[in-house]
């Protein structure tokens, strides 16, 4: 699909042949450890590392733009809003944001098993290149299930289930705003099932 245009090495943490990219990190996340998962992330131009604690905090550290190590977050079971260390976007939920427009963010968030889900929040993806979301459901999102908002490219969303969201402010938002929202310069996106 279009997500793979100009990406011969693959999308997210995976090569095009479906195997993990060299040196990829894999973090298993479930309700009881979403606030406590850890990994070291390069956070300055001298190679200095900071230990990220919690799923959102680890992604925040990637936003600095110094670490492009492929990262696979593997969701097991249902992770609810209250299980998260924090949410980067109060209007959407988990935030994956690049340092600037189309920043290389080789991150995959994937579900493991038939019950993998996030509940009570969605995801905001902004200013990224190479993000993959797959194999989990989004339930009771704040606004959109997935918002690709501003300057994203080469994003692959597949094998996902989207359910009703929270009631929005407009008359047509009784069961949430939307499922996947693409805005403002987002290009080369593949959504498939």
Q: Which sequence ranges carry the predicted segments?
A:
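Generic short beta-strand segments
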Residues: 75-81
């Amino acid at each position: 699909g279009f997500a793979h245009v100009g990406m011969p090495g693959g999308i997210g943490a995976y090569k095009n042949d479906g195997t993990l990219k060299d040196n990829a990190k894999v973090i298993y996340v479930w309700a009881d450890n979403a606030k406590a998962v850890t990994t070291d992330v390069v956070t300055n131009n001298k190679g200095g590392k900071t230990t990220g604690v919690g799923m959102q905090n680890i992604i925040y550290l990637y936003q600095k733009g110094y670490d492009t190590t492929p990262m696979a977050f593997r969701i097991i079971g249902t992770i609810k809003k209250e299980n998260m260390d924090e949410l980067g976007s109060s209007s959407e939920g988990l935030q994956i944001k690049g340092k600037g427009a189309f920043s290389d963010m080789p991150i995959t968030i994937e579900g493991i098993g038939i019950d993998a889900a996030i509940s009570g929040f969605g995801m905001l993806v902004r200013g990224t290149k190479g993000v993959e979301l797959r194999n989990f459901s989004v339930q009771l999102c704040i606004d959109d299930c997935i918002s690709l908002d501003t300057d994203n490219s080469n994003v692959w969303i597949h094998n996902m289930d989207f359910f009703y969201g929270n009631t929005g402010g407009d008359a047509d938002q009784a069961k949430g705003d939307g499922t996947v929202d693409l805005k403002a310069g987002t290009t080369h996106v593949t959504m498939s099932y």
